[in-house]
Amino acid sequence: VYADMCSSVLSNAVDRGVAKLVTLSALYGQSTRNLEKQLPAGIGAAGVIRSIRRYLSYRSLLEKLQEKMQEANLRNYLGRPLPVDKQRLLVSHYLQSSVAEASMVMFSDFCLNEPTAVPLFVIHDALIVDCEKELADRLLNEKILFLDFDNAKFPVKVSALRNNYNS
């Protein structure tokens, strides 16, 4: 998402870290005054937030969520009920809940497709597995793994916490 924001919205004027900050600010409502202090010179916070919200169809999503909230039928993308009582939290709760559950589905699919990968921990959007050397070597060689969800591919960074096997 953030790499896409870098190129598609921010014309590669900032690195991924700044793109992440701006994207999260646009979605979760950080003040432009605070954001302005963290942006490189020449990049206006208000304009960037508007551009990102437009690119992500933020207003359309917010309107749909407000409608569902009024109907008492607010659910995340996968259908889990969302108990949100403040409109300013609609988008952030919807996105966080949806992404967390989609991650679980993708992690589960990965483990089913890679039977030697034994899940140890899930920490936010990270899956920590114990696996055989061959799988570890293949994953580390690829560096990025693409997991599928709802006809979309999501890039996942692969890294090793510790090498406990002998070469």
Residue ranges and their predicted role:
Residues 1-167:
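Conserved catalytic core of nucleotide polymerization and phosphodiester-bond processing enzymes
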